[in-house]
Design a protein with these regions (language model features):
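Conserved subregion of the PPM/PP2C metallophosphatase catalytic domain
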Residues: 1-114
Length: 114
């Protein structure tokens, strides 16, 4: 994951969300850094979710963070939908969680449905 948040993988056959957490430095941070390659076996209906920390670190007025567990729950609850709909549901849930509190970090999502 090149120093970014863990990749979330919804496994349709097991009906669960896994965190693919690989250690490493951010892309471009260290010249000549050798990244490890990994392999994930995917099946029809599985979903890959790449996201920036603007999602998990989104705050509400009580200074609570949206967090990875909420993100995993939203992915699980919407896994039967299209990639576009999953993205929209995540953004809606983050917005509802913030309750109008300012979003100070960027949000980037990439949803891939197999």
């Amino acid at each position: 994951n090149a120093g970014h948040n863990p990749l979330l993988v919804y496994k349709a056959k097991e009906i669960r969300v896994e965190e693919e957490n690989v250690k490493g430095t951010a892309i471009g941070f260290l010249e000549g850094y050798k990244y490890k390659l990994g392999k994930i076996v995917l099946n029809e209906g599985d979903v890959l979710l790449y996201y920036t920390d603007g999602i998990t670190e989104a705050e509400n007025a009580n200074k609570e963070l949206f967090g990875i567990e909420r993100l995993k729950r939203v992915l699980l609850e919407n896994s039967y939908k299209s990639a576009q709909s999953i993205k929209e549901e995540i953004l809606k849930e983050v917005d509802n969680f913030r309750e109008g509190y300012e979003q100070v970090d960027d949000i980037t999502l990439l949803v891939v449905k197999i």
